[in-house]
């Protein structure tokens, strides 16, 4: 399940223009981008693109917006190294190269008609936002939707205004937690690990699917809690984080035994990868 690549050649980036740049946290920015030719990116929730900057190289970044939002796509970028630091210097009107979209998306046909538990940790909310927006724009296609989000601290939360809107919406049941809080923070949510948000949930495993996006250290603990609630591995989707260089399964940097994260993933059903060495 993939969108259409920007160009006939998978290796040639297409020119795109930055529309706006928004600060999400002190270390993360949201880039709203459009193709120079005006066409849609053609992605699906869960896919990624390869972003290139002349003189700086290329990096894989998940798409943070839904394909239902026309005229642009968005990328959430954490400043973590040389390339992303260079991206953080860009402003509206600047151009960059985009290859993609690449990878296996969330299985929308299978998600339709199901109750969803969408679990994100840290900057994992950026790719999950693509799926949340899709559900928001097509509410009749899904059952109940629970959004669980955990961050290091209140200031590290992404999309604060959207989190508040989702929390206030009758369409979503939204629960948030942070690992730590100081006396200066104004935060009314829970304090603790994201795993504490799962036991209070009430759902039928036969009609529920969970999706998880976050730091690798989070996955095993979250999966264990979902299993305790009776949710089987074939009803848990995970988006795996790997260093994807080529994006088309040629370089092997993102391999997990016989699978390539850039092509067979990044979204997998848990039963497909839970027994593979190094997957989780």
Locate predicted features:
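Ferredoxin-reductase
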Residues: 2-94, 152-153, 179-180
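FNR/FR-type flavoprotein reductase catalytic core
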Residues: 4, 82-245
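Local cysteine-cluster metal-coordination motifs and their immediate loop/turn environment
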Residues: 241-266
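Short Fe-S-cluster ligation motifs
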Residues: 257, 268, 272-280
């Amino acid at each position: 399940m993939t969108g259409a690549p920007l160009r006939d050649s998978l290796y040639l980036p297409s020119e795109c223009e930055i529309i706006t740049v928004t600060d999400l946290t002190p270390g993360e920015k949201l880039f709203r981008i459009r193709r120079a030719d005006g066409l849609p990116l053609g992605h699906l929730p869960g896919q990624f693109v390869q972003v290139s900057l002349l003189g700086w190289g290329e990096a894989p970044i998940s798409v943070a917006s839904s394909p239902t939002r026309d005229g642009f796509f968005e990328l959430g970028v954490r400043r973590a190294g040389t390339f992303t630091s260079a991206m953080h210097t860009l402003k509206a009107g600047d151009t960059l190269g985009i290859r993609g979209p690449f990878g296996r998306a969330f299985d929308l046909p299978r998600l339709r008609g199901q109750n969803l538990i969408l679990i994100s940790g840290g900057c994992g909310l950026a790719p999950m936002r693509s799926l949340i927006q899709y559900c928001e724009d097509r509410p009749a296609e899904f059952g109940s939707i629970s959004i669980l989000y955990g961050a290091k601290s209140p200031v590290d939360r992404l999309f604060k205004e959207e989190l508040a809107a989702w929390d206030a919406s009758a369409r979503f049941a939204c629960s948030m937690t942070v690992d730590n809080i100081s006396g200066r923070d104004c935060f009314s949510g829970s304090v603790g690990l994201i795993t504490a948000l799962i036991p209070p949930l009430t759902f039928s495993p036969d009609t529920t699917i969970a999706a998880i996006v976050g730091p690798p250290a989070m996955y095993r603990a979250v999966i264990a809690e979902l299993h305790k609630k009776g949710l089987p591995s074939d009803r848990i989707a995970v988006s795996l984080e790997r260093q994807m260089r080529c994006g088309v399964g040629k370089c092997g940097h993102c391999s997990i035994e016989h699978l390539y994260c850039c092509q067979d993933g990044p979204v997998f059903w848990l039963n497909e990868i839970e027994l593979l060495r190094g997957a989780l």
